[in-house]
Amino acid sequence: MYGIEYTTTLTFLILLVLLNYILKSITRIMDYILYHFLLFIVIVTPFVNSQNYGINLPITGSMDTNYQNVSNPEPFLTSTLCLYYPVEAETEIADSSWKDTLSQLFLTKGWPTGSVYLKSYTDIATFSINPQLYCDYNIVLMKYNANSELDMSELADLILNEWLCNPMDIALYYYQQTDEANKWISMGDSCTIKVCPLNTQTLGIGCLTTDTTTFEEVATAEKLVITDVVDGVNYKINVTTTTCTIRNCKKLGPRENVAVIQVGGSNILDITADPTTAPQTERMMRINWKKWWQVFYTVVDYVNQIIQTMSKRSRSLDSASFYYRI
C-alpha cells in the first residue's frame, strides 16, 4: 500500500517538474519572439511613412488650411511650385530644352529638380474657365493686354481669394446678395448674365419677369463673370445655362498660396479697389520686360522673395470642387 502511495507521489512530482520545464520553455520562446519582433519594429520604423488615423472631426469654414510661412533660406525640399505662363512664351523661346534650363536655374535657388512644374495656358479667358492650382505654391504670369484687362482683374480676384460656393437654381428661385462679400460667379465657354431686380411684391423694377429681353444685361459672352448687384434686393436671373454655370459664392479671405505677376503694361491691376478684398498687393506684382527669357530669369532670381509673401496650403483651387466648397 505504501509502495503505491510513494509511486503516485513520485509520479506527481515528475509531472510537476515536467510541467514547470514546459512552461519555462514556452516563456523563453515567447520572450525570444517578442524581443526579435520589437527589434524588427525599431529597425523598420524609420523607413516607413504611414498615416495615423483618428476620429473624424467636423470641418467648418474654408477647407484650406494655412501653414506657417517659410522664412528661412533653406531649400524647399518638401514643397512644390507651379508656374503658369501663356503659351506664347514657348513660341517666342522656341527651344525644346528650355524647361530643363529653368529647372537647373531653380535648383540654384534651393528648389530640387522635380519640385517645379511649368504649365502653359492658351489665354486668360480660356484659363478662367478651369483654373487648377494644385501645387503648394502657385505663381501665375499674366501678360498685360488692354483688351482683356477686366478679364485679368476678375481672374486675379478669383484665384487670389478663397470662395465658399453653392449651386443656384435660377429656374425656380429668386436670389439676393446679403452683403459685399456675397457674389455670383459664372464660368463657361460663353456666359451672358441678365438680371431683373424685384420689389417687395416680386414685380420687376424696370423689367418684366416673364420677358428676359427686358432684363438688365451685366455680362455678355464672357468666360468668367463675378457679378455684384445691390445687396438686400431679390433678383430674377437669366443665364445661358447650356454654356455656363452660376454659383452663389461668399468671399472668405485671401488664398495665400497663389501669387499673380503681371507682365508688361503701363498700369498694374489693382483688385484691392474691391471693398471686400483685403490689401494684398504683395501677391499682385508686375514685371516690365519685353522678352520671355528675361521674365523667367527675373522670376527665378526672386522666387524665394515671392514665396515669403505667401503661405503654403494643404488644398489648392480646382474649379470642379470650387463650385461647391473651398
Curated annotation (Swiss-Prot):
Region: GPR motif, residue numbers: 253-255
GO terms of molecular function: metal ion binding
Subunit structure: Homotrimer; disulfide-linked. 2 Ca(2+) ions bound at each subunit interface in the trimer hold the trimer together. Interacts with the intermediate capsid protein VP6. Interacts with the outer capsid protein VP5*.
Note: Some rotavirus strains are neuraminidase-sensitive and require sialic acid to attach to the cell surface. Some rotavirus strains are integrin-dependent. Some rotavirus strains depend on ganglioside for their entry into the host cell. Hsp70 also seems to be involved in the entry of some strains.
Disulfide bonds: 82-135, 165-249, 191-244, 196-207
GO cellular component terms, semicolon-separated: host cell endoplasmic reticulum lumen; T=13 icosahedral viral capsid; viral outer capsid
Protein name, entry field: Outer capsid glycoprotein VP7
InterPro entries named among the record's database cross-references: VP7, VP7_1, VP7_2
Binding sites annotated in the UniProt record for Ca(2+) 2: 177, 228-229, 231, 301
Signal peptide (from-to): 1-50
Region (CNP motif): 165-167
Post-translational modification: N-glycosylated. The N-terminus is blocked possibly by pyroglutamic acid.
Annotated source species: Rotavirus A (strain RVA/Human/Indonesia/69M/1980/G8P4[10])
Function: Calcium-binding protein that interacts with rotavirus cell receptors once the initial attachment by VP4 has been achieved. Rotavirus attachment and entry into the host cell probably involves multiple sequential contacts between the outer capsid proteins VP4 and VP7, and the cell receptors. Following entry into the host cell, low intracellular or intravesicular Ca(2+) concentration probably causes the calcium-stabilized VP7 trimers to dissociate from the virion. This step is probably necessary for the membrane-disrupting entry step and the release of VP4, which is locked onto the virion by VP7.
One Pfam family of this chain: VP7
Compartments in which it is found: Virion; Host endoplasmic reticulum lumen
Glycan-carrying positions: 69, 238
Main location: virion
Family: Belongs to the rotavirus VP7 family.
Keywords: Calcium, Capsid protein, Disulfide bond, Glycoprotein, Host endoplasmic reticulum, Host-virus interaction, Metal-binding, Outer capsid protein, Signal, T=13 icosahedral capsid protein, Virion
Positions bound to Ca(2+) 1: 95, 206, 214, 216
